[in-house]
């Protein structure tokens, strides 16, 4: 099987063309491939499939390193767009794809950044999903013998965003896994730790569902900005500084889609016998 290794701000992916190759990935195989000592090593596996709808260009599938399939990955979306152009699967700059729970438009700019229409953030608890009686801008949760204030949103996947004074000292390693699997998140969640530098600039670390802390989380950056705007903390255009680098997020508020712009890098191509 041929594959490419790519990364978006250090969030790394194994990307496989299932348009011209016949492939099947069991959870066991994905876990084996994701092993950084015995396999290829990656945070997520991205699979390019033929479109299910003739109006679209491709179907986009995402698997975490633990073998679970998820419906959204923002950094992966940027790598997906670069991959299909690099491999000659399309020459379009605006690429329309379906995911497990919707559609996306991936736009490759002249300087090879990728702008992704991530859709409108969804704050309805049932849609996240999150167990709550009604939608709130801020929720109170108990975890690890602490009372935690957080915002909750779906960007096509569930996110919990906590504001912290300093991301460098935030309890990502201890609070992250506890909140990820908290009983109020029936499908688990990605946990963002957000430091507001100013209205146009945040710092962020994300403990990702099924992957642990990563160098960058695109949908996590989108979620943090969406929650920050909803809570009145942030402007409509925000620079997000992650351990792996910078993303630019823009959202005009309810009724509008949120846009993420950032880089995607090709590392190498490989072949592996399965």
UniProtKB/Swiss-Prot annotation:
For site (Important for dimerization), what residue positions does UniProt give?
Answer: 268
Q: Where is this site: Could be important to modulate the pK values of the two catalytic cysteine residues?
A: 159, 208
Active-site residue list: 73 (proton donor), 217 (proton acceptor)
Family annotation (Gene3D superfamilies): Diaminopimelate Epimerase, Chain A, domain 1
GO MF term set: diaminopimelate epimerase activity
Answer whether the UniProt record assigns the keyword Amino-acid biosynthesis to this protein. yes
Q: What is this protein called?
A: Diaminopimelate epimerase
Protein's organism: Salmonella typhimurium (strain LT2 / SGSC1412 / ATCC 700720)
């Amino acid at each position: 099987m041929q594959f490419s290794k790519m990364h978006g701000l250090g969030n790394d992916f194994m990307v496989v063309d299932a348009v011209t190759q016949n492939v099947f990935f069991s959870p066991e195989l994905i876990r084996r491939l994701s092993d950084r000592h015995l396999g290829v090593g990656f945070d997520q596996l991205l699979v390019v499939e033929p479109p299910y709808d003739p109006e679209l260009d491709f179907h986009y599938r995402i698997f975490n390193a633990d073998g679970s399939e998820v419906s959204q990955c923002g950094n992966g979306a940027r790598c997906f767009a670069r991959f299909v152009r690099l491999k000659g699967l399309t020459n379009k700059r605006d690429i329309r794809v379906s995911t497990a729970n919707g559609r996306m438009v991936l736009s490759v700019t002249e300087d090879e950044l990728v702008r992704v229409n991530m859709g409108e953030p969804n704050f309805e608890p049932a849609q996240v999903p999150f167990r709550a009686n009604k939608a709130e801008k801020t929720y109170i949760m108990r975890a690890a013998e602490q009372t935690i204030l957080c915002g909750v949103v779906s960007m096509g996947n569930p996110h919990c965003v906590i504001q912290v004074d300093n991301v460098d000292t935030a309890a990502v390693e201890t609070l992250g896994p506890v909140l990820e699997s908290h009983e109020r998140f029936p499908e688990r969640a990605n946990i963002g730790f957000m430091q507001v530098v100013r209205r146009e600039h945040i710092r962020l670390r994300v403990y990702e569902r099924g992957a642990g802390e990563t160098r960058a989380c695109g949908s996590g950056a989108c979620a943090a900005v969406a929650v920050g705007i909803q809570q009145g903390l942030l402007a409509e255009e925000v620079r997000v500084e992650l351990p792996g680098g910078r993303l630019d997020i823009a959202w005009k508020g309810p009724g509008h889609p949120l846009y993420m712009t950032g880089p995607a890098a090709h590392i190498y191509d490989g072949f592996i016998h399965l």
